Amino acid sequence: MEQSNSVNKPSGYSFIAKTLHWGFVAIFAYGIYKQVDTIEQLEDAALLRFEVIFAAVFLTLLLLRFFYMTRTQSSSLPESTAWWQKLAAKVVHYGIYVSFGSIAASGILIGVLYSLGVKAGFVIEAIVGLHEISVTLSYYLIALHVLAAIYHRFLKDGVWSAMVPVCKED
């Protein structure tokens, strides 16, 4: 593989962009760690309230991050990157936003329906199914994202160093 020269390397992301990125890593990891194992756990009113608030905050931060990133930041991929890699990067990034948004929105819907007494039936089962599919999809997309970052670390094209604060490409 040919390595890109320094003229073609991206300049990097802003401090805010990096903070939002790594903050979401922490928030998502926490959400997975404390996840509800069964819907019946939502009988605990305090847990139900916490889950809905957590999902609402997560969704709000996700929307803020999306608008910040799309309005103020540009891709860290070098201009010489193949068109299909640029397309794949967009699909994975937007896919992560959609899957994260679906996780939070479906979680809120589950919480609202459960609090209204809708604890079984097609509607809540469909929303739980969407929630589970979104979580699974997010795992695959995150794995692709991490693998692509590692790939770019080995390319030494500046993509890794644009967002990752350790193991710089120097």
Predicted segments, located by residue:
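Membrane-embedded alpha-helical bundles that constitute the cytochrome b-like, heme-associated redox core
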Residues: M1-D170
